[in-house]
Design a protein with these regions (language model features):
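C-terminal cap/substrate-recognition subdomain and adjoining C-terminal extension
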Residues: 9, 32-40, 187-318
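Structural beta-sheet core signal
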Residues: 178-180, 291
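Non-catalytic pre-domain segments flanking phosphatase-related domains
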Residues: 2-115
Length: 318
């Protein structure tokens, strides 16, 4: 979700057990109602109602099974994702639920799945460690695979359980579509990370170097997305990246999708953009049996038989 200016990301800050329970209950109620969860606007009355930010970071590191040493810029980001962590277990559980659902619906005609990229099919935890939860589009692009406009290798690992789930879906005859808020300029690099460098028509790299640290370059090994007619940006594969303002495709120019944003000359909000793309996919004759995302904005506004929320405590994108 990175090619265009990105909404501010924020680390979850605990604010006392009672408030946390209220917030979680409210979020669950909102999710059930199919509405966008509101931004947290509670103003603590005292320090005792907050969790220390460093403690919150430690909670996140424990959840992901990361080293406990303070990371900071470039610290322990190059440690491989812990496949035995609570995060990995929870991600695999959602992937298994998805696999079971897709298997049960395998007789559906013209069936498809739609998947977000960041923290749905690729895990960006190493960037959170690298940046100390301070998103910067330039450094983030290096993890995506770009230094300027030059492809320098991908650094994001696959989300635990998801490559197997998507591969199973492909074997069952599902069309595979990826839908991300990353910009068109990151399209090829994203294909390289999801599938392979050669699948994206890019040099087949084996390492990537960021801030002086060299790590193995990652090709996650997902199936190639299903081809569609020419989309925005001239791409014909089934990875939908977000076009620049002023270059949205005609199918998004509807009042319920990006029409108001197109008229105003501003970026289309995630919910309207992603639901508009899903509507387009279904207009091509597909039945989206499952829609997978780590943000509520990946999942809301319909055009999918069932949605699956991947775990991600690191940031919130409306």
């Amino acid at each position: 979700m990175n090619g265009l200016p990105r909404p501010r990301r924020s680390l979850w800050l605990g604010i006392g057990l009672g408030v946390v329970l209220v917030v979680l209950a409210a979020a669950a109620a909102v999710a059930i109602a199919g509405l966008q969860p509101a931004d947290l606007t509670y103003t603590p009355n005292s320090e005792s109602q907050m969790t220390n930010i460093d403690v919150s970071r430690a909670y996140a590191k424990n959840y992901y099974g990361a080293p406990t040493a303070t990371s900071g810029a470039g610290g322990t980001w190059n440690t491989p994702l812990n496949q035995d962590s609570n995060y990995a277990s929870e991600a695999r559980s959602v992937a298994k639920q998805g696999d079971n659902w897709l298997s049960a619906r395998s007789k559906v005609a013209d069936k498809a799945i739609v998947l977000d990229v960041d923290d749905t099919t690729l895990t960006t935890w190493n960037y959170e460690l690298y940046s100390n939860w301070d998103f910067n589009p330039t450094t983030n692009a290096q993890f995506v695979g770009l230094t300027g406009s030059t492809f320098t290798g991908n650094a994001f690992p696959a989300t635990p359980g998801m490559v197997d789930m998507v591969s199973d879906a492909k074997a069952m005859g599902y069309a595979i579509f990826f839908l991300t808020g990353r910009g068109d300029s990151q399209h090829q690099a994203t294909i390289a990370n999801l599938v392979s460098d050669t699948a994206a028509g890019l040099p087949d790299l084996t390492t990537v170097t960021i801030s002086g640290k060299t790590v193995p370059e990652i090709d996650a090994g997902y199936p190639m997305p299903t081809p569609l007619d020419i989309q925005h940006g001239g791409f014909t594969d089934g990875l939908f990246t977000k076009p620049p303002v002023g270059q949205y495709p005609a199918y998004l120019n509807k009042p319920q999708f990006c029409g108001p944003s197109i008229t105003a000359g501003v970026s289309c909000p995630t919910i309207q953009y992603k639901s508009g793309v899903r509507a387009y996919v279904e207009s091509q004759g597909y039945d989206i049996v499952g829609n997978f995302g780590d943000q509520f904005s990946d999942l809301l506004n319909g055009f999918a038989d069932k949605t699956f929320k991947m775990p991600n405590p690191n940031y919130y994108l409306p």
